[in-house]
C-alpha cells in the first residue's frame, strides 16, 4: 500500500490543528467511553503535507494511544525542545526498552501486542512509512507504566 501511495501524494499547505481535529473526531466516542482526558494545545501552524495521508498516520497513532491507555490522558502539543515537532503523549502502559527499537517494524507486536491480543503490528509501521514519504519523521520515547510519546518532526512549519 505504501509503495502505491507515492503517485497519490498531493502536497499543499494545510492548517495543522485542523488535521489533528479531524483525527480526533474519529475517536471522540472512544475518549468519552474510556474516560480518557484529552489535552489539546492550541497551535497556529501550517504544514506542507498531504492531508489525507497525514490524517491516516495521526489516526493510527491515536488508535494505539487509546488502545494502550486504560485511564489518564492523551496530550497533543508542539515540543518545546525539538523544533517543528508535534507530540502525541499518552499515560498508557508504555513500551519496554527491548521492544521500543522494533515497534515500528512491519508485523512486530512486542510484548504488549501479544499480551493484549489487539495488535497487528502494522499501525506504527504504516505511520512511520507514510510519514517518511511525506518528509516527516517519527520517533518514539516510552517508559513502562508511565506512557509513550510519539514525536513527529513535520519540517517546514509556518506560523
Q: How should each PLM-predicted stretch be described?
A:
Residues 10-28:
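A conserved beta-strand-to-alpha-helix junction within the catalytic ATP-binding
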Amino acid at each position: 500500500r505504501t509503495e502505491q501511495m507515492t503517485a497519490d501524494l498531493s502536497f499543499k499547505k494545510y492548517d495543522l490543528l485542523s488535521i489533528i481535529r479531524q483525527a480526533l473526531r474519529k475517536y471522540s466516542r472512544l475518549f468519552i467511553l474510556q474516560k480518557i482526558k484529552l489535552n489539546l494545545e492550541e497551535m497556529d501552524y501550517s504544514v506542507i503535507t498531504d492531508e489525507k495521508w497525514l490524517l491516516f498516520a495521526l489516526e493510527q497513532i491515536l488508535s494505539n494511544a487509546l488502545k494502550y491507555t486504560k485511564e489518564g490522558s492523551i496530550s497533543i502539543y508542539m515540543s518545546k525542545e525539538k523544533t517543528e515537532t508535534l507530540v502525541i503523549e499518552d499515560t498508557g502502559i508504555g513500551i519496554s526498552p527491548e521492544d521500543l527499537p522494533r515497534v515500528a517494524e512491519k508485523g512486530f507486536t512486542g510484548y504488549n501486542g501479544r499480551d493484549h491480543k489487539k495488535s497487528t503490528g502494522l499501525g506504527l509501521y504504516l505511520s512511520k512509512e507514510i510519514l517518511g514519504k511525506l518528509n516527516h519523521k517519527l520517533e518514539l520515547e516510552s517508559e513502562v507504566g508511565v506512557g509513550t510519546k510519539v514525536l513527529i518532526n513535520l519540517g517546514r512549519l509556518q506560523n
